[in-house]
Amino acid sequence: MFKQNFKNDVVEIRGQKIGLGESKLIKIPIDRLPTGTLIEIPIYVFNGKTLGPTILLQGGLHGDEVNSIELVRRMLIDKSYKIHRGCVIVVPLLNVFGFLNMSRDMHGKDVNRSFPGSKTGSLASRMAYYLMEEITNNVDFAIDFHTGGEQRNNFPQIRYTPEDGIGFELAKIFNAPFMFSSKLIPKSFRNQCFKNNIPVIVYEGGESLRLEENAIQHGIDGTLRVLKHFNMIHRNVEVSKNPTSIHINKRNWIRAKVAGLFTSTVKNGEKVEKGQTLGHIMDTYGETNFTIKSPSNGYIIAKNNFPIINMGDALFHLGNP
């Protein structure tokens, strides 16, 4: 299923060539701050000594998703990218502007809704353009690391495109606690890669602006499983053994039927039964207490950690195998 016509004999990014057995740090200039400070995207390229697949590992597409940045950074520090076959292109932090401003977006625009981008467009559009033109065209497949947003915590999970058979196989190899298919979103990175016949899986773990060790470690372990599967790193690299991913076939958000203060009585990732109490919504005066019950058997694959909620807010993401 995975193609064998590998192209990592010479990898070229921004006019710089990286041959077999070479590694290089490349910085792509994007723009300057109003102070004149140059903002660059750091790209690490680790090319093995023999031909093999080229994989992109990307963090920080959304600037506030710090778990995605930390897990890629930690693998750099731990020297997990000692590649002897194939090539790994590592982008620890794509959305530098969003990161500096602790924001998902870049100047009000979502980079992940800006693909394929434009060389002369907005900052978000230009960043999308350089990612596709300078980096992604080199790769055979990619892992895009994310977290939940707006204080929604995603239990470690892998998402793949329904029509992408290779993505499905990659998701199984990654072996996160949960995996499921997710429809393509127009102008997203995954959508553009699908159009370009580049399989992408998306790892989601934790929530924005919070470092969470469990989410970080699951992301690292899954990435190492993929690298080991393709013999890109040595077999003696230790990876923790997970139970086989639970494949979620149906998902729905349980939403608040009233406004108030929200408390949860279940843990993220927990298996729940139909009718089980999941949490409570109380008014600020202690007069009402609305009980939230599970509509079916399943697993909590994400939960809202924000205590002040309005009617209709998403509280629990329930997944059914």
Where are each of the predicted segments found?
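Structured catalytic-domain cores with a bias toward divalent-metal coordination
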Residues: 1-321
